[in-house]
Amino acid sequence: MRRVHLIIDFQYLYHRHIYSINAGRKRRLSCMVDGVEVDTTRIYYPLKDFESFRRYWESLGKEVTISVCFDSKSDRKEADEDYKSNRGGRFDSVDFEAINTIRELMSEAGYNIYKEDGKEADDLIADLIKRYENDFDFTVIYTPDSDMMCYLSEKVGIMRYKTGGNGKKGDFSSSHTPVSINNFAEYMSAELKCDIRLNTIILYKALCGDKSDCIKGVKGFGPKAFDKFISHLDEKGTDYEVLVKPSEVKKLILDEVDYLGESAVEQALYALELIECSPVTVTESRPIKNDSLEKREKAYMKYIMKSLVN
């Protein structure tokens, strides 16, 4: 039986539902716990999506190990106040309580949980890939972030969530697009409107910026300029494979972007610092398969969420 490792960026699962819940577009759920009625709306819907991932891969006959990565307040925010300043929908105390409950339930159900002060889920995901990719036959990252595509390989794929999805409204499964080394170039070139190559996503964001995270990049450097830059690198026979390493991206920027001037080099390197995943040590805890039907039942039935057990 092939062993599949699912690495899940939790934050988007919660974000996906919270706006609909607050707008009254989702049915409110509750149950009695120790004689007290508890609102389980914010707990149930993210867990429902989460468990659907496990069920899908198990239905294909895979042995599934799951790791869930949670955001903490990022050190990057202290380095640059504009970083992710465009993110709306700030969480309140009710949200934080729900997220903590979800994390506890996932842990009790036997899943691998990762969270580290000052680090984002992306940092933890990157470290899990670097350390444990070879422990499994294949790894799938569930994320909305294109940054993670620098880790695509023969053994790593991505299920990328995009708001609105590719199918019917509300159809969660169809709002994830499978991205692999085989379809990356076509998929991202269509999104970014330029000739993007495998392993060049970090270089692109360092030069052109990343609007989703409020990272500016080089002033005036857009998709057309990136195409010209790639043509220049092609002529030089550049090895794009090494650009999975931020250190190699930095070296290339220092060697090849100087024609735009010292300011452009500084802007690109500053953007790279914000994009680069930070080193972490928390994931030294090796991901193992420890979940079971019995553990899920014990965890989820505290809140009478029977549909999540099987």
Q: Across the structure, where does each feature detected by a protein language model lie?
A:
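Conserved RecA-like ASCE P-loop NTPase motor core of nucleic-acid helicases/translocases
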Residues: T139-D145
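Single, functionally critical "micro-switch" positions that shape active/binding sites
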Residues: I8, P144, F221
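Non-catalytic nucleic-acid-binding/docking modules located in mid-to-C-terminal regions
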Residues: R2, Y56-F70, S85-F91, Y111-N112, ...
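Noncatalytic, basic helical substrate-engagement surface that gates or grips nucleic-acid strands
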Residues: R2-F138, L152-S175, E276-T281, D291
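Acidic, divalent-metal-coordinating active-site segment for phosphoryl/phosphodiester hydrolysis
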Residues: S146-D147, S153
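Alpha-helical elements of the RecA-like P-loop NTPase motor core of helicases
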Residues: D123, M149-C150, D227-K228
